[in-house]
Every structure is written in structure tokens, then in C-alpha cells.
A protein has these predicted regions:
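Phosphate-handling DNA/RNA-contact segment within nucleic-acid enzymes
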Residues: 1-86, 90, 104
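A charged alpha-helical hairpin associated with nucleic-acid processing machineries
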Residues: 38-47, 74-90, 94-229
Length: 229
């Protein structure tokens, strides 16, 4: 035991209350339920990250034991790195409301600088009337597992969310689309995934891939062919 975490039942603030931080207990590093979930994570090669303690408890009650939650904080790079050491795939599960989409976008942003080629991050956005607790009670564990297994990959979620924010139906929209994609592409550490996303962004923005690379000030590690004399 390195600390305690509490969650208000019903209305009240603060929603989450944790022990004071110490050298052993830092919220930005710890995940609720990770110790209990480790065996299931190793078995499934997948970990599901939900927003709250009670979501973890409800999922475990229905036999889904590979779920963890942050300690009332936003996802950090420390969380992502810790989970990637445990699993091949992270599924971030958020409510489908505006707050959930904001939290998902933050999780995507911090994942880009930690996700290597060969690992997977997915995003499962529930319908606005559900959180993981209510969904698994209403639809059952198998439905939740199926949704987690087929959740949107980071690449798909990133590009579709950018296009939702900046529709690419006009030149101005495409300009905003590229401008918002730029810092995300630049922070990626997975060169193969980065190149594929660069191509997707260029296609949607109706730009030549090399022109986009130049505009973003990026270099890609492409194999070069040597001309024979």
C-alpha cells in the first residue's frame, strides 16, 4: 500500500480524493487496479484504461479484469510507458460527451511521444448515455470485450478527429487540418506509423506528400536507391 484513493458517491466535490503525494505515491505515475490486473493484462496482451475507480470495480465484477484507471488525473506519459511495458495494446475508454472527447484527445497527445512501432493504442468512445459501469451492466461483458477489441486505432481516431474539428471541404479547412496535424506528427517516435499518418494527412489535405513533409519541416527516413553508372 502506497496511498489511498476515494471517490464521492453521488454529488459532491472533490469527486476524487487521494492521499497526499509522497516520494512513493505520485498520481501522475500510478494507476488504480494495475497490481490486480497484471495477470489478466499479460494473458490478453491488452489493457483497458477507464476514467474512474468504480468503472474498474464494475468491469471486474463482470469478469473483465484487465482494466485500470488513473487516480482522478489526466493520462500522463508515465502512465502510457508503464502500460506499454505490460501490454501490446492499450484501449482508452471514455464517455462520449465533450469531456470524454477532450480526455481522449489528451491521451492521444501524450501517447504519440511514447508509442513505438509494433504496439497499439486504441480509443473506445461510448455513447453519451453510458460509462463503462452502466454499459457493462446493460449490455454485458462480451459486448464490452468486443467493442474494446475493435475500437478505433490511434491513427484512425487522430485523423478523423482532426477532420471533425477542421472539415477538409474547403482550402481554408484543409489548411487548418494540416496546421493542427503538424505538432502531432512531429512528436511521434514511431517512424513507420508516422510515415503512414503523414501520407493519410497529405491525401485528405489534397497535398503532395513531399510538399507536406517540407511544409511541416520534417524529415522521413526513407531508403534511397543508388543509381548505377
Amino acid at each position: 500500500v502506497i496511498g489511498f484513493g476515494g471517490r464521492v458517491i453521488g454529488a459532491g466535490e472533490p469527486k476524487y480524493l487521494n492521499s497526499p503525494e509522497t516520494p512513493l505515491f505520485e498520481k501522475r505515475r500510478e494507476l488504480y487496479g494495475l497490481r490486480e490486473a497484471r495477470e489478466s493484462i499479460r494473458k490478453d496482451s491488452r489493457v483497458v484504461v477507464v476514467e474512474g475507480y468504480m468503472d474498474v470495480v464494475a468491469l471486474a465484477q463482470h469478469g473483465i479484469e484487465n482494466a485500470v484507471a488513473t487516480l482522478g488525473t489526466a493520462t500522463t506519459s508515465n502512465h502510457v510507458l508503464k502500460l506499454l511495458r505490460q501490454a501490446e495494446e492499450i484501449v482508452f475508454c471514455f464517455d462520449g460527451d465533450a469531456a470524454g472527447r477532450k480526455a481522449a484527445w489528451h491521451a492521444l497527445d501524450v501517447s504519440l511521444a511514447s508509442l513505438p512501432d509494433g504496439k497499439m493504442v486504441r480509443f473506445l468512445m461510448l455513447s453519451p448515455e453510458h460509462d463503462p459501469d452502466s454499459f457493462v451492466r446493460a449490455e454485458g461483458a462480451e459486448a464490452f470485450r468486443q467493442m474494446a477489441a475493435t475500437a478505433a486505432p490511434l491513427s484512425e481516431f487522430m485523423v478523423s478527429e482532426l477532420a471533425r474539428r477542421s472539415p477538409v471541404t474547403t482550402a481554408e479547412g484543409r489548411s487548418r487540418f494540416v496546421n493542427e496535424a503538424k505538432p502531432l506528427l512531429q512528436k511521434m517516435v514511431a517512424p513507420i506509423l508516422q510515415l503512414q499518418l503523414l501520407r493519410d494527412v497529405a491525401r485528405r489535405a489534397e497535398l503532395d506528400e513531399q510538399d507536406l513533409t517540407r511544409l511541416l519541416g520534417m524529415q522521413t527516413n526513407r531508403p534511397t536507391s543508388s543509381a548505377r553508372p
